Amino acid sequence: MKLTFNKNLYAFLLMLSVVFTAFAQEKVKPIIKDGEAQIVEAFNNPDEWIRHDLWVETSFDTDGDGKLDRMHVAVTRPKQTETEGLKLPVVYESSPYYAGTAGFSEGTFWNVKQELGETPKPRIHPEVTRTGKRPIISNSQIKTWVPRGYIVVHSSSPGTGLSQGSPTVGGDNESLAPKAVVEWLCGRAKGYTTPYGNETVKAYWSTGKVGMTGTSYNGTIPLAAATTGVEGLEAIIPIAPNTSYYHYYRSNGLVRSPGGYLGEDIDVLYDFIHSGGEEPLTPMKNTKVNDANLPNQLFKSKREYSNAMVRDTEMKNGMDRETGDYNDFWAGRDYLNDMAPMKAALLMSHGFNDWNVMPEHSYRIYKRAKEMGLPTQIFYHQNGHGGPPPITMMNRWFTRYLHGVNNGVENDARAWIVREDDPRDKPTAYEDYPNPNASNVSLYLSPGAPKKGGLSTKKITTNKSETLVDNYSFTGSGLAQADITNHRLLYVTPKLTKDVHISGVPKITVTLSSNKPAANLSIWLVSLPWQEGRRAKITDNIINRGWADPQNHKSIRESEPLEKGKFYTITFDLNPDDQVIKKGQQIGLMIFSSDKEFTLQPEPGTELTIKLDETSLTLPIVGGASALTSAFKN
């Protein structure tokens, strides 16, 4: 049988072959729509993700073995980064928590029942049992970002998990460790397949554009990395970050616990996270430490060495739990002091009712970043600790600065605040925070103890003083609700006839004397009447809080004993806030001494006498004095 050649059919089949080949060779890439990275189905199958781990070499040695510490890093990436040579930007999260933490057994925290200024009694030191299996460090972030065309990277911070080194809780190595990981992602640092070997591994799948995010300690680390100015870290989204360990464990010279963790201090957190360093410190003959502050001894493990060097020497000598004063130890753990090199675009998130990592932590960094001219946005919600911005905000931020898409995010509103009755994913846009229409209004006190005194915009000379008696056994909420008590002073505004919008940082000035050389000073702003029961919301009752040590009336670096009968004036900020106080409520200023939820608890009986004429409250009110006085009128 003779076959006849058909040129038309051949041409058609050839064209079809070219089309199929071109289609087969078309590579998957991220999809951007409306300024946001979209979920790409080809990236959305977890079974096809490539997961592997490695160790990145840092520039420091903090575990005493004489070798540069290596950080344990895990990578999750779409298969196309291997099969098609696709390069993608990176979303990176680092944490000290991934490999387990110590428990809260009795004696782990400092005993807060002590006299002020006394040396505290010793506490116990729990050990962490490391958890986790290679190659996975964490599964956080991956379901959000890998399908949208990102690679997700995790690392354990120094001295935790399989990362070498020592935890320092805000020390330099906790900034330099994520810096090294970013540099590896950008091709400038060495990565290894094992913690001690020489076989290298490269991040050939990375575009060299890195963003970082995380919550709480995991949110602190992005800021720490950004303060190094490392090239390639383009954007960070810290969520409820601790930006100063002094501000976390102290207030204006006062020893003050973070909310929910009474008796915690920086060394407690060190023990809580120290899951690494179980391996022997070898060779043993080289582990003898000659340090004036340490016994001349051999250490059995890296963990033992780190405990001696960091917890039992640096922290013990620097944290100063006796006075609560600010010093160089704390200054070295305050990221505000390190921001000069920072270049990363900053989107911050925090809750106004976060009494663990308080809202001042984000505001102080946001404010400085604005002054530096960095791209900045801030998202505040009305809840407690944690809580990211809406995914749309995060997506637009990373799309702009990691994918490099000009989506106009830098022209969006600078501040986004969730109003009291709105869901968290429906924030209200504002030109900035604090509200540009807010101005400071001073309020003054009139007598009323042991009941309630007055709080108004009119200053009336009374030449009167009122006295409270410290007793830590009473809670702040109980004192605020009491009709009569000599354990607090409470001054209230008239009942509001209109809503009052507070936006900014309230300030308090108190002139006081004490019958003892040391005293706690606690300030609450409250909304009255107090709401109880299931219907009470987190935005009810407590408007703001603040604490101070009257011994530090001159400076948070210097304290002096109080002379009996002598009056001292101390001025300090409360926390940033943006809250609408509803009409029908009264704003109350409560002054008391020991705060059962936050401060040390000395024996009851200390008397604080307040000069009313020389004590005042400053509130940032949207609409200023006219708005507030109008709300006071019947």
Give the predicted meaning of each segment.
Residues 132-135, 161-178, 189-192, 384-390:
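Catalytic nucleophile-loop/oxyanion-hole region of alpha/beta-hydrolase
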Residues 146-162:
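Conserved alpha/beta-hydrolase
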